[in-house]
Amino acid sequence: MKNRYIQQFEDAQLKDKSMPTFKAGDTLRLGITIKEGEKTRTQYFEGVCIAIRGNGVDKTFCVRKIGANNIGVEKIFPFYSESLASVEVLRVGRVRRAKLYYLRDRRGKAARIKEVRH
């Protein structure tokens, strides 16, 4: 159980943050702010959300994409990170699991996720 003062501080931190709702299986496009010296730029990372864990300020999510030479790249982001400039849900996936770690072993068409029909 957390101290009530810590809980009040965390609630105040979360009030002014807004994130789109997404779940494991959704394809996301993340804008990450990168500071290089005096300049700042936004780099985009697009992939499938394979896990969401934690709650409150400690909540994180893991995004996986297939990079150059068919090498899988996974990045874990804090949900309320200052470095996340934008989060956009591109596709809503239909999966039956909360953690999609089995996608690490799949290649090509076997790694596809069905899309939710509207």
UniProtKB/Swiss-Prot annotation:
Keyword check for Ribonucleoprotein: yes
Q: What keywords tag this UniProt record?
A: Ribonucleoprotein, Ribosomal protein
What InterPro entries has UniProt attached to this entry?
Ribosomal_bL19, Ribosomal_bL19_CS, Ribosomal_bL19_sf, Translation_prot_SH3-like_sf
Name any one GO molecular function: structural constituent of ribosome
One GO CC term of this entry? cytosolic large ribosomal subunit
Gene3D superfamilies hit by this protein: 2.30.30.790
Instruction: Provide one Gene Ontology biological process annotation.
Output: translation
Key word Lipoprotein present: no
Organism superkingdom:
Bacteria
Record's family? Answer: Belongs to the bacterial ribosomal protein bL19 family.
Q: What does this protein do?
A: This protein is located at the 30S-50S ribosomal subunit interface and may play a role in the structure and function of the aminoacyl-tRNA binding site.
Q: Which HAMAP family match?
A: Ribosomal_bL19
**Which PANTHER family does the entry link to?**
LARGE RIBOSOMAL SUBUNIT PROTEIN BL19M, RIBOSOMAL PROTEIN L19
Q: Which NCBIfam families match?
A: rplS_bact
Q: What is the name of the protein in this document?
A: Large ribosomal subunit protein bL19
Q: Which organism is it from?
A: Helicobacter pylori (strain J99 / ATCC 700824)
